Amino acid sequence: MIQKLIKNRQRSKWVLFTGASLWIFFILDFMNSNYYNTESHISSYSIYNVYDNLHEETESPPKSALSSSLLEPSTNQQTSDFKNHLLYKSLISSLFQNTTKQTKDLNSNIYDDIFSNHKLETVLGTLSFKERCDLYFKNVFAEDVNWHFNPDTRYDMHFDKNTKEFKDFIKVKELVIQEKFDKMKEKFKEEDYNRELSKLKKSMFTDFLNEKFEQEIVNRLSTFRIFNKCYITNDETPQINKINQFITNQQKLVQDIHRDESGNFYKSKIDKLKLTNKEALVDLMVTKSSTFEHRVYPWISKEYPVYERWTGKVYHEPPNYYEILNHDPMQKTPKKIQQSNNAAQPFLKQFKNKFNGRGIVLTIGNQHSDYAVSLIHLLRALDNKLPIQIVYYDDVNEESKRKIVTAAQEDFRSLPHSFEKVAHLFGDKYINSQGKGLQPQEVWFVNAYNSIHKNYRGKFSRFGNKLLASLFNSFSEFMLIDVDTVLMQPPEYFFQLKNYQTTGTYFFKDRSVLQRRTVEDGKFFERMGPSTVDQMMFDIPIMTNYTTTRELFRGLQHYMESGLVMINKDKHLNSILMITQINLIGPITGKVWGDKELFWLGFAINGDEEYYFDDNFAAAIGELTPPQDRARKDGTWHHSKEICSPHPGHVSGDDNHSLLWINSGFRFCHQADEVNFEKEAKKKTRLKHLHTADQFRTFYYNPLRITHAVVPPLDQDLQDRKNAMDEPTSGWLWESGYCKRYMWCAYSSVGGPQKRPDEKDDTVDNNETKDNTLDGILVEYNQDEIALFNYLGDIWVGTE
């Protein structure tokens, strides 16, 4: 009997074991069939495959440009189905009362997946912020278990009729192409049919690729925005309070829409969310957001930069400036600085929670060390007390560091003679007789080389260095400046600007040169911004007129001058992260010059319009051209005033007078080392007080002398103002023959009478001549201001 019982138990165990094994095998087989195809490389160490721990450096082959979607209308060409839902339209009416999407409302394809499987009222009416985040990324994985952002992606629009993609497209779209051509061919001669048909095929294929690439970029940008808000800044109290209030109000609105006038639900109560099989299986695979972070930011190595103080002491994490600088009140940070590291948190969240203090940031290489010395001297003359972080990428040697530290810490009490005229402006404590004279500077060197994954260090060369400096400096609030930026106000002045304190940013505009771009660029940038469903799901606002009415969106080529940028990183980290990401997306960077526009466009694309531009476009600063030097042919003088200078300057929009900063150093011509002085002396069209090559050489190497500033006017419609009086038609003229092509002339007014005084205008009553004169801003500085500019110029150049 006992033996029989034992055999029965053994048989039962065997049956249970066999059944459990088969069940596990079934689950694994189901997961494999859902998430991998025959080309997938299955990893035994992580469901994130090669992208999490850098076991493999190459990406999987890109998918074909064509897909089965060619057989049906693309999601780019039609509104996503859920947007036609009555509830969605009702929420749109409520949420977007004062703004509308001006361009096609492109959204991430992930939303289409979500709302094809779940009711709108369930997602928007029942889910918390965290639940929405998790649902979105469950669907990212369900769509592609190996999803990652590849900074090397090429959006290649090169046309080749011999490619398989093109041939497949023509085959699938043959009837559509023929139908379209039949409507057009009456415009052409019969012998031109083949050529015109080929052009049509190329045009339609190019449009297809454009739409495909745009959708791919939108998918990525949406994922960046959502990941950052969900997992990087989700511990910030202002965000928590705002998103909780947003969702509470939204869910109440959904509930109200779902009820009839008596307060009863129309059909039934709102269903709770039930995950699909794919979404449920993702639960078995998703681990920490810190792991997924590497898929979003593969170029970040998750190593802190090395922070080296001028004393030689090295910190391997962001330094606590309040403690290091003897409890300097300017370095006190309201938030609690996180000292320890938590491996379960994303690296960027840990880094964020260590930001502290306020300071100046610049990025240099060895070739910039002389400029850096001049800048340090200037900051001492301005009595700067803020720490300075010089961010570099392993390309600043010890000799350059010694030069900069010497400039920052050496005894500096021998001042140029021009100081005598401004000494009364600074007070008795300006020169410390017991110390080192002018205020020594707290200089730090920040080596961010190891913070960038080795595969992507070349992605941030040249202008990109500034973008990384914005991220890897350790300040909560920072002023980012170029090494050739010349401050005319103490750095603390900029942090006290009202609009900076309100918004956490302060940006400056470029020269308002009437160089134009297509308005389609602006529409493209708007399409790259948040969609209406981004705002509805995650409270990430769409672009408004605050952004889309700016001159760049209306066709101006250049808008922002990035020689000085003010950002509160505690408020705007997600926008800084977006700036660094769009720097890696060719179709975006291809529409701008360098880093300039990426700062504010990064904010707008991130759904962050809490940025502020000074009202004034850049000015020309220097001395007025004598009116007789530019007289008309008849000897009369122009109404407009002119300044020709290689230096853009920035006049405060608060008072239309104060000079805040200038660019391109303080020598008259920062390209003097490259100038052919004999050639420029022979031109005799500008700088007519100079006659010989030696005079040009002396003038170019000496400090710029500033008596006036001109902010040229800009026509509202970005048009030239033609006139009959030889007045300038636009505010800027490029004088390429001087200062190695860096000279620009600015005019205090544009336009003028449409007829000369001796010409009768029969089209106007009383012989009043039409006049389209538009005035800008002409600033004349007083003797104290001029003396201060002279002193700062002498300090920068090193005049004794």
From Swiss-Prot:
Keywords: Glycoprotein, Glycosyltransferase, Golgi apparatus, Membrane, Signal-anchor, Transferase, Transmembrane, Transmembrane helix. GO terms for biological process: mannan biosynthetic process; protein mannosylation; protein O-linked glycosylation. It is found in: Golgi apparatus membrane. Its EC number is 2.4.1.-. GO terms for cellular component: Golgi apparatus; Golgi membrane. It is a single-pass type II membrane protein. GO terms for molecular function: alpha-1,3-mannosyltransferase activity. Residues 1-12 are cytoplasmic. Induction: Expression is negatively regulated by RIM101. Expression is also increased in absence of SUR7, as well as CHK1 and NIK1. Pathway: Protein modification; protein glycosylation. Residues 31-800 are lumenal. Glycans are attached at residues 98, 545, 656, 767. The chain crosses the membrane at residues 13-30. It holds the Pfam family Mannosyl_trans3. Coiled coil: none annotated. It is an enzyme of class 2 (transferase). Responsible for addition of the terminal mannose residues to the outer chain of core N-linked polysaccharides and to O-linked mannotriose. Implicated in late Golgi modifications. Belongs to the MNN1/MNT family. This is Putative alpha-1,3-mannosyltransferase MNN1. The lineage of its organism: Eukaryota, Fungi, Dikarya, Ascomycota, Saccharomycotina. The gene is MNN1.
